Amino acid sequence: MQALLQEILDHVHPLLAQGQVAQYIPALAQVDPNQLGIAVQSLDGQLHCAGDAHTPFSIQSISKVFSLVQAINHSGEDIWSRLGYEPSGQAFNSLVQLEVEKGRPRNPFINAGALVICDINQSRYATPTLSMRDFVRRLSANPRIVSDAVVAESEYEHRARNAAMAYLMQAFGNFHNDVDAVLRSYFHHCALSMSCVDVARGFAFLANGGLCPHSGEQVLSRRQAQQVNAIMATSGLYDEAGNFAYRVGLPGKSGVGGGIVAVVPGRYSICVWSPALNASGNSLAGLRALELLSERMTGSVFSAIS
């Protein structure tokens, strides 16, 4: 496994020069694009990694999965009265669709949907930022995970479009808490700093029917884990989810920090990171690495069982 992972990283390394780090978040624009790491966590506890797998990075939209799981934990099916689970077919920060559909976001992985989920969690937790941090620490078995205050503040200073979404949803009666407070929580979630190892371990419960393999905690029911994986498969990579399903064939979630996490139900959770992005905001080398790994080792969830 170790040799295979290193071989894949060597193969995709030339792609680092073809992507570009996220420019619209100033703190992320300073990240060295020549970094590349991968970690594979098996359900029997084995961890395999290569490259910069232990280097922390800003998980950004990967945090939307953790937020969704928190909301499902305390509110269950009730959350779907406020948002859907359909692909949007629009940019992740589109206002047009939100206006047409009267403030009800298509799914929890576009920005408007993630803000609704944060609004739901804001009503539940006295300190949402700390609750999220502690939740992620528990899932990843790493008590040192923190949110990068510099990144969070950088995002807050460029909050206009996200604030516009929140106020638009508030106008339609679908946003209940103080907009500024929810935005603060949202940006601190996005600014969580985790390594490939942390993320792969933190998502292992979704490969294991909702059961965290290292702690024995039933994070979600088996059915709920299936549902989260389904939304990741249809909506997890911005407007490139179809491409990811076609090329990789696994439930996944990406972030503009360059991370992509993927789940192989019953087998593995995987995280790859390279901050050089393609035009859709997904890691260029990361996508190709996961495609090669799917071909060589994991297989697609759409494959026939042999």
From Swiss-Prot:
Gene3D superfamilies: DD-peptidase/beta-lactamase superfamily
Record has rRNA-binding as a keyword: no
Classification via InterPro entries: Beta-lactam/transpept-like, Glutaminase
GO molecular function, one term: glutaminase activity
A single BP term in Gene Ontology: glutamine catabolic process
Keyword terms: Hydrolase
Pfam families per record: Glutaminase
The keyword Cell inner membrane belongs to this UniProt entry's keyword annotation: no
EC number: 3.5.1.2
Catalytic activity: L-glutamine + H2O = L-glutamate + NH4(+)
UniProt-annotated binding residues for substrate: 61, 111, 155, 162, 186, 238, 256
Quaternary structure and interacting proteins, as annotated: Homotetramer.
Similarity field: Belongs to the glutaminase family.
Family matches, as PANTHER family: GLUTAMINASE
UniProt protein name: Glutaminase
Gene, per the UniProt record: glsA
